[in-house]
Amino acid sequence: MSALRSFQRSSNVAKSTLKNSVRTYATAEPTLKQRLEEILPAKAEEVKQLKKDYGKTVIGEVLLEQAYGGMRGIKGLVWEGSVLDPIEGIRFRGRTIPDIQKELPKAPGGEEPLPEALFWLLLTGEVPTEAQTRALSEEFAARSALPKHVEELIDRSPSHLHPMAQFSIAVTALESESQFAKAYAKGVHKSEYWKYTYEDSIELLAKLPTIAAKIYRNVFHDGKLPAQIDSKLDYGANLASLLGFGENKEFLELMRLYLTIHSDHEGGNVSAHTTHLVGSALSSPFLSLAAGLNGLAGPLHGRANQEVLEWLFKLREELNGDYSKEAIEKYLWDTLNAGRVGPGYGHAVLRKTDPRYTAQREFALKHMPDYELFKLVSNIYEVAPGVFDQHGMTKNPWPNVGSHSGVLLQYYGLTEESFYTVLFGVSRAFGVLPQLILDRGLGMPIERPKSFSTEKYIELVKSIGKN
């Protein structure tokens, strides 16, 4: 009898413990994936109703010059994470860059937003708590190990192969790890696509710092990583440590800022659109991002900061220490009159100073106000818009993000310009992968716009008549 009572007491304790455990779990903050499971059904229904009620509504017109002009300004894509206003600049889920700098969680003692928190925001439209952000940092760290064949592929790449080519190759090789590809091959229902796309995206983001760092250390140093991923560190801090800059607290802050503000810029730019386009064919996140990285590698897209630095070095040499506004203005006019352009100024959409430029300028004013290259960039900023506006070089004579980021990296000793686009690529993954997950969750179809030949366009415009 005593034994029975003892058993009952033990059983009650066990039940109480289980009950408390369940209660604790039930009241714990939801994970990112759990929040998506809660959010997506309502979002999908909203889109379904929108198409039902307004599916035949005209949302814009297309001019012939747009068809021949890179499709600029054509309303034809859905991109949930960010919207680019020509005057205000980018808004992430309705929030400006100053907003996210203020609202998003930060590292202990840090002042810059964490890219993990932005990833959460872009996916859900919500600002995560510090605990949720920390959990995401830990998940990225836990899933960071590279498959052996990817490590060997990077290590065997010749050092003269451009870092972006190596980056794309390594990301493509991660296709072997794709849960989405495996699930699709087994016939998983399309309502489950987003879950496997989510898992692949987390896995991919987790592995990018190690891939980027191995490429950097192989091409420019001794091939050895100076650190390992630390589960106690945030994403930007781990990336900085792997590159060899982990002891510099300011550089850690720069990586957090850099990864956040370079992440997303609407869906029409080459890297974002390419990732979305390839993903619309139900290619995995690994193949889709690799395609986007190849677009980012193009000199008209992700190479701007490298070209700006090359131009600044030449300008510095020619000015020979005279960084006066008068000397800079003369050089700019000589450049324009010679048929060349001033890199780092102008944008396809923006008509004011890029707020991403402003964020980097404020960082420089705080951390490197006396740095020679920053002083030069700062003086150019005060002179160039007036010169470019007077000349008519661009509809937007204001600086873009590419005119400043390279200077910040140079200051801290990351001077290898050909690697800069790899950092851009790591950052851009934080913007394009959330949309890929949402594409699958909302059941977005394969992209297939209509094309015409020039002869067909001639026939078409003649039938319509001139304006």
UniProtKB/Swiss-Prot annotation:
A GO term for molecular function: citrate (Si)-synthase activity
Chief location of this protein within or outside the cell: mitochondrion
Taxonomic superkingdom: Eukaryota
Annotated Gene3D superfamilies: Citrate Synthase, domain 1, Cytochrome P450-Terp, domain 2
Catalysis performed (reactions): oxaloacetate + acetyl-CoA + H2O = citrate + CoA + H(+)
Cellular localization per UniProt: Mitochondrion matrix
A cellular component term, taken from the record's GO annotations: mitochondrial matrix
Key word Transmembrane helix present: no
Alphabetized UniProt keyword annotations: Mitochondrion, Transferase, Transit peptide, Tricarboxylic acid cycle
Pathway: Carbohydrate metabolism; tricarboxylic acid cycle; isocitrate from oxaloacetate: step 1/2
Protein's UniProt keywords contain Transferase: yes
One of the Pfam families matching this protein, by short name: Citrate_synt
Annotated active site: 301, 347
GO BP terms in the entry: carbohydrate metabolic process; citrate metabolic process; tricarboxylic acid cycle
EC number(s) reported in the record: 2.3.3.16
Enzyme class: transferase
NCBIfam families membership: cit_synth_euk, PRK09569.1
Recorded family membership: Belongs to the citrate synthase family.
Miscellaneous: Citrate synthase is found in nearly all cells capable of oxidative metabolism.
Protein name (Swiss-Prot/TrEMBL): Citrate synthase, mitochondrial
Organism: Candida tropicalis (Yeast)
